Amino acid sequence: MNPGDFKDFAKAMTDYITEYLENIRDRQVVPSVKPGYLRPLVPEQAPQQAEPWTAVMADIERVVMSGVTHWQSPRFHAYFPTANSYPSIVADMLSGAIACIGFTWIASPACTELEVVMLDWLGQMLGLPDQFLARSGGEGGGVIQGTASEATFVALLGAKSRMMHRVKEQHPEWTETDILGKLVGYCNQQAHSSVERAGLLGGVKLRSLKPDSKRRLRGDTLREAIDEDIRNGLIPFYVVATLGTTSSCAFDALDEIGDVCNASDIWLHVDAAYAGSAFICPEYRHFMKGVEKADSFNFNPHKWMLVNFDCSAMWLKQPRWIVDAFNVDPLYLKHEQQGSAPDYRHWQIPLGRRFRSLKLWFVLRLYGVENLQKYIRKQIGFAHLFERLLTSDERFELFEEVTMGLVCFRLKGSNEINEELLRRINGRGKIHLVPSKVDDVYFLRLAICSRFTEESDMHVSWEEIKDRLMMFLKSKGAVLIKIICSTTRRTKNILTYIKQNIFRDVGL
C-alpha cells in the first residue's frame, strides 16, 4: 500500500467509523448468528495476490459487522461499560504508527516518560495520596496494565515477594516451599473472579470472606479470619478490597480493612476497576476513604473514562517489591540509563507493551477534567432515572442501592420468573442485559454503558422491559385459558392453581 492509498483508505475508514458510531442505536445490539457463522463468508485460504483496499471495505459489513455485539450502543446494558471516544481512537492510530515496544526507557523514552506523567495527572484527579505519585519524589508511582486482572495478580506477586523476604529473615531455616504453603490472602465473597484466579496462578491460598447485609467486607470479619489463620500457623500476606463489586457495585469498608491490614503489616490492594472513574468527582470520594492505608490501587479508565481498551491504571507505594519479583535482566535489555527512569518491563507480567499513555494524554487534554466529571455525573443520572421508572412499577423491586451507573433489579417473585424475563428480553435483541445472583437471589443488571446514551434511551429500554413482561404475562394467560377450557375440576381448584402457579410468579 502506497501513501496515497493509505490516505484514501484511512479517510474511508474514519468516515465509516463516524457513521457507525453516530448511528449505532439503529443496529440490533446482539447479532443473530450462530457459532461458526463466519467461516463460510471468507475464502478457505489467504489470497496469493494483493487485493485493493476497497474490497476489504466492502466486506466489513458482510463479514465483521454481521457478527458484532455493539457494546457502544445505548441499548447495550450488560457487564460494565468499555469506554470509547474519538480522541482515544486517534491516539491508538498514532500508537500504531509509532509501533514501539516500550519495555525499557531506552526502547522509547517518550513511551515511558509520558506514562509516568499521565499516571501522576490521573492520580491527582482521583485525589490519591502523594505516596502513590512519582512527582512526590518518593518511591511510589503508577503504571498502565492491560486489565484489572493483571493488576490484581501483579499486586499479589508483590505482596508475596515482600512476605517471603520478611519470613526468610525471621526463619532462615524455612524453605520457599515451607513458606508458600503457609501464605494466605483474603477478599470479599463478591470480589471479581480474577482475585481467585490470581491466587491460583500465584500458588497461594485465598479465602473469600462473607460480607455484611450491604455486601461489604468489614474490618471485624477480616480481623477474625486473620486471627484464626495465625492460630493455625498460617501467614496472612494479602488483602483485596473491592470498591464497586461486579455483581452489584457494593463497596467494601476500605477504612476499616486498611486499619486491620496496617496493624498486621499485610499488603492491601484496592480494586476499583469500574467505580474508580467516579472518584474524579469529589462527591464520590467518600467511597475510597482510607485509601492512604493501601499499598496498591487500581482502576480502569477503559471502562468509564472515555479511554479505549486497554488502559488499566495501577499505583504502588513501593514498586520495588514488584520489580524484585519480576527482575530478569539479560544483557540485551540493559542500558546506560537504568535506575534513572522506570523500566516498565519490571512492573508487569509481559515484556512488551504498547504506547498506551497516548490515549490518556489525548483524552485528558481534549475533554478536560470538568467535561469528564460532567460525563460521569450524567451517566449516574441516567441510572437514577431508570431507578425512578422502575420503582414506579409495583411489580419490580431494587436489589441494591443505586450509587453509580448500575441498576440491580428484579421482578417480584421467584428466581425462575426473572430468568424467563431475561431470556425474553435478550431473545428479542433490542436491548441486552446480564444477570447475577447473590445469596441465591437472581436479579438483572442494567448498566449505563454508552457515551451516546440520552434520556430517551432509558425510556426505550424501560418500555422494552415492560413489553417483554407483558408478552410473558400474556403467555401465562394463554396457559390459564387452556386450563380453564380443558379442566373438569371445580372452580375452587382452578382458582387455587391460578394463585399458586400464575400470580405467585409475578409477585401478585
UniProtKB/Swiss-Prot annotation:
Binding residues annotated for substrate, in chain numbering: 82, 192
Superkingdom, taxonomy of origin: Eukaryota
UniProt keyword Lyase present: yes
Binding site residues for pyridoxal 5'-phosphate: 148-149, 246, 300
Coiled coil: none
E.C. number(s) listed in UniProt: 4.1.1.28
InterPro entries assigned: Aromatic_deC, PyrdxlP-dep_de-COase, PyrdxlP-dep_Trfase, PyrdxlP-dep_Trfase_major, PyrdxlP-dep_Trfase_small, Pyridoxal-P_BS
Molecular function terms, GO-annotated: 5-hydroxy-L-tryptophan decarboxylase activity; L-dopa decarboxylase activity; pyridoxal phosphate binding
Listed cofactors: pyridoxal 5'-phosphate
A GO CC term assigned to this protein in UniProt: cytoplasm
Reaction(s) this enzyme catalyzes, per UniProt: L-dopa + H(+) = dopamine + CO2; 5-hydroxy-L-tryptophan + H(+) = serotonin + CO2
Top-level enzyme category: lyase
N6-(pyridoxal phosphate)lysine carried by residues: 303
Pfam families: Pyridoxal_deC (PF00282)
Record keywords, A-Z: Catecholamine biosynthesis, Decarboxylase, Lyase, Pyridoxal phosphate
GO biological process, one term: serotonin biosynthetic process
PANTHER family linked: AROMATIC-L-AMINO-ACID DECARBOXYLASE, GROUP II PYRIDOXAL-5-PHOSPHATE DECARBOXYLASE
Similarity annotation: Belongs to the group II decarboxylase family.
Oligomeric form and interacting partners: Homodimer.
This protein's name: Aromatic-L-amino-acid decarboxylase
Gene from which the chain derives: Ddc
